[in-house]
Swiss-Prot record:
Heme binds at residue 464. The chain crosses the membrane at residues 1-21. Involved in stress response. Does not function as cytokinin hydroxylase in yeast heterologous system. InterPro entries: Cyt_P450, Cyt_P450_CS, Cyt_P450_E_grp-I, Cyt_P450_sf, Cytochrome_P450_Monooxygen. GO terms for molecular function: heme binding; iron ion binding; monooxygenase activity; oxidoreductase activity, acting on paired donors, with incorporation or reduction of molecular oxygen. The lineage of its organism: Eukaryota, Viridiplantae, Streptophyta, Embryophyta, Tracheophyta. It comes from Arabidopsis thaliana (Mouse-ear cress). This is Cytochrome P450 709B1.
């Protein structure tokens, strides 16, 4: 009996010893070796702190930067949103190493290196590890996070949903939803008993509601009312994610029944139940499922053969992905473009003149119209440059690999700070921080000193599948608004405080004064 106890103690000591050794390797030895290895290549950065890395510094800098309020005419938002990048770039150069907990991250801002990494088709750079809260938001089995053969299968199934013919059909939905919003604005303006009535609108909220209605109707055949629970759950999950961003992520803790985890689980369950109701409604009402995004996904569920088949769980996760991405990206693009046009009345008038010339004052826009709206395209591209959807892109090296002259160790995350690249004066000229749509007069590839200086939708095989949808939606909405209303000015209470809440958005909303155009 004593021997059994002795052997059990030996085994226990060995297990504990191995755990301690593993923790030592992760927390101390690997960071030490990697730091020295990169230092030999001339790459340095802030000192690594055991367990936390540089998260405490990042949290402090972000907290301080979020107290600042920018001048509305300032488009230099990089220091406010990514203050740690700005500080460390000034100290260590544009390529530096920092630590997100125990995760090593190398920052690069060279567009050629960015293009090489994002265009890799061999799986050498994969999506970097995401926090559990982010995965819950759009699903682990959706297009955002899956890799390899699964990603190829999903992309092949989903591509037809964003074909030119399908987008033409979606445009009619965009027009109908926008007309509803504009009719509400018109009714509100008629209540003003003045010769030149004005109305005040919180444009960020207006665009969030509109784009949610459009994606729910055009992609899922539901409506904003039916999809409202999905959107509400996702907004709550987004808040959970942004709250956790600057905290150390300990593997396994997402399974513990903590108050925050229980809240996330409830929201996830609520969101999926709402999606299941939409799916069930479609299954009962249509024998052929339809040809929109949801219909294409359901056809994949009943398809024979692995190459074109999807499970119900995969369909639910893709629905999460497109419910979120389908309205968040465009609503922010519309909000920032509205802000810029409110500040730059000359460009607002140029767009209106172009719209009246090519589309008239009442004709609803269509795919033929969009190809003629050159100035509109230039303004939207400039808005994407200054206030893109995301602040940075990240990929993890799945093998030891060379990127340019850099030897990137396996497991290292490479980060491209898009806000820095999109405002770099060496790429965009001395007016890089100014609103100047004319830089896109000869197309995107000639707007800067490098053809891939603008990465708002990324490049390569994992470029945003919905970028054409976003562009057409933005053009549709802006065209119809400018046909009927004028952005007079930003309201006095507007605070220019762009913030990174998964996507870049106005921290305190976007109140704008509008005036209906005279007939």
């Amino acid at each position: 009996m004593g021997l059994v106890i002795f052997l059990a103690l030996i085994v226990l000591i060995l297990i504990i010893g191995l755990r301690i050794f593993k923790a030592f390797m992760i927390l101390v030895w690997h960071p030490f070796v990697l730091t020295r290895r990169l230092k030999n290549q001339g790459i340095s950065g802030p000192n690594y702190r055991i367990f936390y890395g540089n998260l405490s510094e990042i949290k402090k800098m972000k907290r301080e930067s979020h107290l600042s309020i920018l001048d509305p005419s300032s488009n230099d938002i990089f220091p406010r949103i990514l203050p740690h990048y700005q500080k460390w770039m000034s100290q260590y150069g544009e390529t530096f190493l920092y630590w997100n907990g125990t995760e090593p991250r190398i920052c690069i801002s060279d567009p050629e290196l960015a293009k090489t990494m994002l265009s890799n088709k061999l799986g050498f750079f994969v999506k970097s590890k995401a926090r559990p809260e982010a995965v819950k938001l759009v699903g682990s089995k959706g297009l955002v996070f899956i890799e390899g053969a699964d990603w190829v299968r999903h992309r092949r199934i989903l591509n037809p949903a964003f074909s030119i013919d399908r987008l033409k059909i979606m445009t009619t939905v965009m027009v109908d939803c926008t007309l509803k919003m504009l009719e509400e604005w018109r009714k509100e303006s008629t209540k003003e008993e003045t010769e030149h009535p004005k109305i005040k609108k919180e444009m960020n909220e207006e665009f969030q509601r509109l784009t949610a209605d459009i994606i729910a109707t055009s992609a899922f055949g539901s409506s904003y009312v039916e999809g409202i629970e999905v959107f509400r759950s996702q907004m709550e999950l987004k808040r959970c994610y942004t709250t956790s961003l600057n905290q150390v992520s300990i593997p396994g803790t997402q399974y513990l029944p903590t108050p925050s985890n229980i809240r996330v689980w409830k929201l996830e369950r609520k969101m999926d139940n709402s999606i299941k109701r939409i799916i069930s409604s479609r299954l009962q009402s249509k024998s052929d499922y339809g040809d929109d995004l949801l219909g294409i996904l359901l056809k994949a569920y009943n398809t024979e053969g692995k190459e074109r088949k999807m499970s119900i769980e995969e369909i639910i996760h893709e629905c999460r992905t497109f419910f979120f991405g389908g309205h968040e990206t465009t609503s922010n693009l519309l909000a920032w473009t509205t802000m810029l046009l409110s500040l730059h009345q000359d460009w607002q008038e140029k767009l209106r003149e172009e719209i009246f010339k090519e589309c008239g004052k009442e004709k609803t826009p269509d795919s033929e119209t969009f190809s003629k709206l050159k100035l509109m395209n230039m303004v939207i591209m400039e808005s994407l440059r200054l206030y893109g959807p995301v602040s940075a892109l990240a990929r993890e090296a799945s093998v030891n690999i060379k990127l340019g002259d850099l030897e990137i160790p396996k497991g290292t995350t490479v980060v491209i700070p898009l806000l820095k690249m999109h405002s770099d004066k060496t790429l965009w000229g001395s007016d890089a921080d100014k609103f100047n749509p004319m830089r896109f007069a000869n197309g995107v590839s000639r707007a800067a000193n490098h053809p891939n200086a603008l990465l708002a939708f990324s490049v390569g095989p994992r470029a945003c599948i919905g970028q054409n949808f976003v562009m057409i939606e933005a053009k549709t909405v802006l065209t119809m608004i400018l046909q009927r209303f004028r952005f007079i000015s930003l309201c006095d209470e507007y605070k220019h405080t762009p913030v990174d809440n998964v996507t870049i958005q106005p921290q305190y909303g976007l109140p704008v004064m509008l005036q209906p155009l005279e007939d």
